Every structure is written in C-alpha cells, then in structure tokens.
C-alpha cells in the first residue's frame, strides 16, 4: 500500500478538517458516561450479562442512525490485538476497553467523530471529537446523541444525584470535557511549571495525550474537568472554555516573546529538528514526538514554509507502535519500530516536498 493511501485511510476524517485556534488547540472532546437501569454495572456484571447488554444496545441503536450518522458496531473479542491498539492510538476507544473489558464493543460513526463505547467502566461512554477549539459544538452533538439514546433505552438516573456511574467522580452529569493543547512556548519558557498547579486548583486535570498517568510528550497536554456533580453541562464546559482561552493567550504571548528575544535560536531549533526528522534512519517515539513539536511550532510561527500544519497531528498518530505494525503488516520489535518510524517520517516529509 502506498504511504498516501495508508495515511488517507488511517487518519480519521474529522481530523483532516480545520477548527478555530487549531494552531494551539488540536482537538476538543466531550464524553458522557451512562448506565442502563435494568443491567448490573460492568464491574459487577457476569460475562453472560455483558453479552446481553451488547445485544440490547445493538438491537436498539446499532441498527438505526442518528440524523445522517450511521454506526458500525465493532466487538473487542473479534479484533486482533493490534487493531485494538490502533483504535486506542486514534483516541476512539480507551485502553481499558481494549484490554480489560468483558465483551466490550464500540459503535463508530463513518467520520469517526462519534464513538460509543459499550461495557467499558460504564455501560455506555458517548464520545464526540471536533478539530480545534469547539467544545460547545461537541457538547451540542453529544447531548443530541444522548437524547436519541435515552429515547430508546432506560438510563440509571437518580433525582438527587443525577446519572449514576461506576466512578464517583462521574456521578451527576457524567460529563468529561477536554481539549488537547500544543503548548511548546510555555514549556520552553518554563511558565508551564507555574501554570499547571494553578489549573489543578481550579478543579481541572492536566494529563498527557493518552490520558491518566501518561507523560505530556511533544508538549501536548490534555486538559479536562474533574467533578461532574452539582454543575450543569453548560457550566462545566464554560469553566473549561475560560481556562483554555487564557492558555491560548498565554501561549501566543510566549511565542511572540521567543520570536522577539531569541529568533535565531528558535529558527536553529526548528531547522535542526526538521533535519533530524528528514534524514534520521532510527528514531525513538519520544524523540520523534519532541522534534515534531518543534517543527509544528516553526510552521505556526512562519519560520518553516511549505510544510502542512497537520503534520504533527498525523505523525503523532502514525508513528505509534500499533500504526507502525499495521503499515508494516507484521509484528515489530522495538528496534524495528524505531527504524520503521524514521522511514515513515522521511517518506511523509518527502510527500510534502513533492507537493510544493
């Protein structure tokens, strides 16, 4: 398969679109946790009960559509390990669903902007992904899907507590709003060390791109709400929006200061990173991610011409182990992955040169 075709098939269609403030906010996500009234929660359910839940959801949801969105139901038990790994790398399912769920499944829309996980920590996890800074738009879509589902199945709901969930932090609205942000200038100027504790004090959580416990590789940070009880969905999203808008302003100001005070050093860093990506024969995931961050910053600041801004979004995913093995068509050792990663990045940058 040609690299162009592999990329076009591998990258989710929603990721190829532009969104507001996409130089800093790569994506916005709304996730709703829901459970069904007549079934035991996944943590307590037997294997047979988990099977019955999937059949129940399939009967009521998978064979119908929400507006123009048709869904495909994929069962974890039917998938090879690497296919599940790829879905995790695309942020379409959680590691928990891929590795630990009893008869887990996922319903995916055609453009992969909507995924509904089944038998994860909760019976249903409704997720909507948008490019750029579009939290409000993602909330509107997620709420619409939630209403559509609620018209077909009975949710576990308490008048005082709201939606009942497996984890106490999700009780209430069951809503988790998050954004993925690229904050290289705040990291370079070390302002991030002062900002992150302040964000945590506001009741928000900062993680790396693969969720809880993951490192913020490539200067990419996932910022989300923590508690869902006692606030409306709109208030939760508005609180997060306010913090994200401040971070956007601070990152832009830090980028401007770096350009004014250290332009030559910044150019050198960007071009060195581009040179390593364009010519290296072996590259580890961590180094590749950092160099891609430098290159993306150079593109956004106009220091590097003729390279697509989407290259960070694309290669952050395509150079993960699951995708590398999918492209190779075989299981790879760590050393083989480092070699393949370097080759794929070189080939992707060559495509940029050929298109200019």
UniProtKB/Swiss-Prot annotation:
Key words, A-Z: Allosteric enzyme, ATP-binding, Kinase, Nucleotide-binding, Transferase
The enzyme's E.C. designation: 2.7.14.1
Binding, ATP: 27-31, 91, 125, 176-180, 207-212
Top-rank lineage group of the source organism: Bacteria
GO MF annotation: an example: protein kinase activity
UniProt activity-regulation remark: Appears to be allosterically activated by the binding of pArg-containing polypeptides to the pArg-binding pocket localized in the C-terminal domain of McsB.
Principal EC category: transferase
One BP annotation, GO: phosphocreatine biosynthetic process
Catalytic activity: L-arginyl-[protein] + ATP = N(omega)-phospho-L-arginyl-[protein] + ADP + H(+)
One GO cellular component term noted in the UniProt record for this chain: extracellular space
CDD domains (alphabetical): bacterial_phosphagen_kinase (cd07930)
Residue window of motif RDXXRA motif of the pArg binding pocket involved in allosteric regulation: 337-342
Domain Phosphagen kinase C-terminal residue range list: 24-254
Summary of the function given for this chain in its UniProt record: Catalyzes the specific phosphorylation of arginine residues in a large number of proteins. Is part of the bacterial stress response system. Protein arginine phosphorylation has a physiologically important role and is involved in the regulation of many critical cellular processes, such as protein homeostasis, motility, competence, and stringent and stress responses, by regulating gene expression and protein activity.
Alphabetized NCBIfam families for the sequence: PRK01059.1-4 (NF002194), PRK01059.1-5 (NF002195)
Family: Belongs to the ATP:guanido phosphotransferase family.
Protein's name in the database: Protein-arginine kinase
Organism: Halalkalibacterium halodurans (strain ATCC BAA-125 / DSM 18197 / FERM 7344 / JCM 9153 / C-125) (Bacillus halodurans)
């Amino acid at each position: 398969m040609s690299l162009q075709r592999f990329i076009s098939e591998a990258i989710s269609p929603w990721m190829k679109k532009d969104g507001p403030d996409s130089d800093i906010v790569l994506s916005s996500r709304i996730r709703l946790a829901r459970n069904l009234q007549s079934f035991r929660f996944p943590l307590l359910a037997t294997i047979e009960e988990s099977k019955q839940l999937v059949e129940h959801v399939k009967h009521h949801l998978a064979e119908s559509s929400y507006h123009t969105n048709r869904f495909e139901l994929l069962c974890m038990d039917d998938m090879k390990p690497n296919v599940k790994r790829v879905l995790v790398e695309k942020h379409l399912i959680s590691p928990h669903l891929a590795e630990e769920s009893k008869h887990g499944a996922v319903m995916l829309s055609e453009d992969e902007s909507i995924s509904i996980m089944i038998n994860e920590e909760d019976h249903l996890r409704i997720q909507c992904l948008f490019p750029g800074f579009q939290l409000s738009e993602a909330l509107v879509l997620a709420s619409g899907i939630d209403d559509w589902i609620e018209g077909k199945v009975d949710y576990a709901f308490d008048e005082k507590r709201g939606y009942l969930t497996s984890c106490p932090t999700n009780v209430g609205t069951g809503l988790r709003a998050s954004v993925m942000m690229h904050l290289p200038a705040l990291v370079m100027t070390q302002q991030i060390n002062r900002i992150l504790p302040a964000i945590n004090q506001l009741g928000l959580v900062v993680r790396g791109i693969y969720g809880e416990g993951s490192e913020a590789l490539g200067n990419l940070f996932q910022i989300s709400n923590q508690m869902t009880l006692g606030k409306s969905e709109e208030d939760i999203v508005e609180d997060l929006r306010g913090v994200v808008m401040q971070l956007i302003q601070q990152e832009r100001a830090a980028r401007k200061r770096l350009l004014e005070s250290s332009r030559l050093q910044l150019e050198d860093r960007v071009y060195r990173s581009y040179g390593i990506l364009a010519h290296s024969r072996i590259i580890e995931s961590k180094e590749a991610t950092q160099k891609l961050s430098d290159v993306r910053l150079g593109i956004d600041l106009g220091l590097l011409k003729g390279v697509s801004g989407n290259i960070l979004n694309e290669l952050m995913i395509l150079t993960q182990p699951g995708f590398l093995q999918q492209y190779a068509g075989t299981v790879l050792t760590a050393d083989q992955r480092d070699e393949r990663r370097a080759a794929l990045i070189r080939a992707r940058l060559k495509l940029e040169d050929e298109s200019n």
